Curated annotation (Swiss-Prot):
Pathway: Carbohydrate acid metabolism; D-glucarate degradation; 2,5-dioxopentanoate from D-glucarate: step 2/2
Protein name as catalogued: Probable 5-dehydro-4-deoxyglucarate dehydratase
Enzyme Commission numbers on file: 4.2.1.41
Molecular function in Gene Ontology: 4-hydroxy-tetrahydrodipicolinate synthase activity; 5-dehydro-4-deoxyglucarate dehydratase activity
Cross-referenced CDD domains: KDGDH
Family membership noted in the UniProt record: Belongs to the DapA family.
Principal EC category: lyase
Superkingdom classification of source: Bacteria
Catalytic reaction annotation: 5-dehydro-4-deoxy-D-glucarate + H(+) = 2,5-dioxopentanoate + CO2 + H2O
One example of a Gene Ontology biological process annotation: D-glucarate catabolic process
């Protein structure tokens, strides 16, 4: 099968896993939420990754999420899945992703182990070469590969991009100027809008947007202003929306996931403020703070009506 070997660019959607109060995955809610992201113009769907509580999913739930995402996307945008953890499971889920019609996968770090560079290279290479799907390498935590190792991985045609979740700008600049446009470069830092002004000038033209799950027009407004040099609007969005939400996110471990769900619930989307342990729900005070920020954002930065 001939595939387009190119990483998605722009604002990337990372849907959450909507659980009901009994902790069961709600497929219809997931479908609706992905449709919402697509209608808002997000350029790709990354399903069952960090925001989708990858680490908590059973194989059946993972399969359900991939099926829903592929169905909802309908070929309009590429669908990437999360694969990683222990190598055997990563390979199984990579095969499953290919079988279910995904376009690629994001390679998450191995479980617990801190390997040497050669081991991390072999881990990534084994997963990359296990299918014909496109692969994006996630630089994070215990799996941060050097320029030399990533350059070796570019020999695999399936590798199309690198997502940075570390924030080592010295390494990022070295990567971009050594490897160039052979790969797509994705900003995957928590609340990526905060750091995107530093990433865009060095060649990172994509980012994973948490807030796009509930205020996608703000994320779009921000990115357009950033690209077009509208510094005043960027500052206003920072001051009134992005930094205040980020301040709440930093209050508790796990809020990178659960704060998204709280935001979606506040905005009337079909998601509850529930997450699986060890991630906890957003606490009442923080929930109310987020509610106030979103109300102010809606008043100050209203969504433009769609033109017919």
């Amino acid at each position: 099968m001939s595939r387009i070997r190119k990483a998605p660019a722009g604002i990337l959607g990372f849907p959450v896993a909507p659980f009901n109060t009994q902790g069961k995955l709600e497929e219809e809610a997931l479908f609706q939420n992905i449709e919402f992201l697509l209608n808002e113009g997000l350029e790709a769907i990354f399903i069952a990754c960090g925001s989708g509580e990858f680490q908590s999913l059973s194989q059946k739930e993972y399969e359900q999420m991939v099926e829903v995402a592929v169905s909802a996307a309908g070929g309009k945008v590429p669908v990437y899945t999360g694969v990683g953890g222990n190598l055997s499971t990563a390979l199984d889920w990579a095969q499953l992703s290919e079988k279910k019609g995904a376009d690629g996968y994001l390679i998450l770090p191995p479980y617990l182990v801190h390997g040497e560079q050669e081991g991390l290279y072999q881990y990534a290479k084994t997963i990359i070469e296990s299918t014909d799907l496109n692969a994006i390498l996630y630089q994070r935590d215990n799996a941060v590969l050097s320029v030399e190792q990533i350059k070796r991985l570019t020999e695999c045609e399936q590798l199309v991009g690198v997502k940075d979740g570390v924030g080592n700008m010295d390494l990022n600049i070295n990567l971009v100027y050594t490897i160039g446009d052979r790969l797509g470069w994705l900003n995957g830092m928590p609340m990526a809008e905060v750091t995107m002004p530093a990433y865009l000038p060095i060649g990172f033209h994509s980012y994973s947007s948490a807030i796009s799950n509930y205020i996608p027009h703000i994320s779009r407004m921000f990115y357009d202003a950033l690209k077009n040099g509208n510094d005043e609007l960027v500052k206003e969005l920072y001051r009134h929306v992005i930094l205040p939400i980020n301040d709440i996110r930093k209050q508790r471990k796990g809020y990178a996931v659960s704060l998204i769900k709280a935001g979606m619930e506040i905005m009337g989307l079909n998601v509850r403020n529930t997450a699986r342990p060890p991630v906890g729900p957003v606490e009442k005070d923080h929930y109310q703070q987020l509610e106030a920020i979103l109300k102010q954002a809606a008043d100050r930065f209203p969504k433009k009506a769609a033109t017919v």
